[in-house]
């Protein structure tokens, strides 16, 4: 009986260790021009309407505690280049600099952008760290 309890305790301890070894958990919500919202997932395409303004709400929870990387270190690439306001060559026009709000271990940014050019555009979101980080690709189809 004691061996079963010890085995269970070791299993739970290793599961807890694995959970803290992975990077931040990120969620993405797209808010449309009419105010409707939907969760979006990496790897799935999202339809946008040319000329319309959207808000991408990004939330991540530092599930491994004591994150050494500031939220501002999150990298957003549009069409392979740093997403920045005032860059007229980018198909998704960023309204202003990306700023984060922190509430304990939860960090949130609301990113306003306009779907400027028709066609397919990719947004890559990257957080680099030794605990798994984050690197995912979102595909937007502007019609």
Predicted regions and their residues:
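Bacterial N-terminal signal peptides
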Residues: 7-17
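N-terminal edge beta-strand
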Residues: 22-57
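Exposed beta-strand face motif in extracellular beta-rich ectodomains
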Residues: 54, 119-123
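Edge beta-strands of extracellular beta-sandwich domains
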Residues: 134-142
């Amino acid at each position: 009986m004691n061996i079963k309890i010890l085995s269970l305790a070791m299993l739970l301890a290793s599961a807890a260790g694995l959970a803290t070894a992975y990077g931040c958990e990120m969620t993405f919500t797209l808010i449309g021009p009419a105010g409707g919202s939907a969760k979006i997932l990496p790897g799935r395409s999202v339809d946008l309407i040319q000329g319309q303004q959207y808000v991408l709400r990004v939330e991540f929870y530092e599930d491994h505690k004591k994150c050494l990387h500031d939220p501002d270190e999150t990298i957003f690439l549009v069409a392979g280049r740093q997403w920045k306001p005032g860059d007229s060559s980018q198909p998704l026009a960023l309204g202003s600099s990306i700023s984060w709000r922190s509430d304990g271990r939860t960090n949130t940014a609301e990113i306003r952008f306009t779907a400027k050019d028709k066609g397919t555009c990719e947004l890559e979101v990257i957080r680099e760290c030794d605990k798994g980080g984050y690197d995912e690709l979102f595909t937007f189809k502007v019609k």
